Regions:
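Glycine-rich phosphate-binding loop of ATP-dependent small-molecule kinases
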Residues: 1-187
Length: 187
């Protein structure tokens, strides 16, 4: 079973992905974690990523698609992926469909965690005191939120027509969201 979790930065995708990993015995494919790993390696790709993130931009589809492709074709992750933060653009969504099809896989569930900007800002401010992330600056988050909403409208349109697309109120308390997800899962 492959699942897409998407929503704006700070929506709680990572938290819900961890829940789903336990629930279905899957693997979290966190685009954010993959990008931070590249930054920590101080690779050329990592340097490009940090420049984009510090400018409040999203990393290029080309870089993200390559990182995702490696994971999808790894046999240990086959039909066990929770996509956390991917796809963010229509090009990425179409790329994901193509890659999955070529590896005899599909997306079983798509969950959109819908959260308003004001809630995101409060969450990021709280998260800053709990963990240190270079992209947890209110101004950067505001810019990333606006960019995300502009970029993702086509992705929402692309997926919302699917019978396996579910919108969840991401402003609910963290412990309430798993019950909403469970209501849709046939597990």
């Amino acid at each position: 079973m492959n699942i897409i979790l998407f929503g704006p930065p700070g929506a709680g995708k990572g938290t819900q992905a961890k829940y789903l990993v336990e629930k279905i015995n899957g693997f979290q494919d966190s685009t954010g974690d993959m990008l931070r790993d590249e930054i920590n390696k101080n690779s050329e790709i990592g340097k490009k990523i940090i420049n984009d993130m510090n400018d409040g931009k999203f990393v290029s589809d080309e870089i993200v698609n390559e990182l995702i492709k490696k994971v999808i074709f790894d046999e240990k992750y086959k039909n066990k992926l929770i996509f956390d933060g991917y796809p963010r653009s229509l090009e990425q969504a179409k790329n994901l469909e193509t890659i999955l099809e070529s590896s005899n896989q599909k997306i079983d569930y798509i969950f959109f965690l819908n959260v308003q900007k004001e809630v995101i800002i409060k969450r990021v401010e709280k998260r800053k005191t709990l963990e240190k992330r270079s992209d947890d600056d209110s101004n950067i988050i505001l810019k990333r939120y606006d960019t995300y909403m502009d970029m993702t409208r086509p992705v929402l349109d692309f997926y919302s027509k699917n019978s396996n697309f579910y919108e969840i109120d991401g402003a609910l308390k963290i412990e309430q969201i798993p019950a909403k997800i469970d209501a849709f899962l046939n597990v």
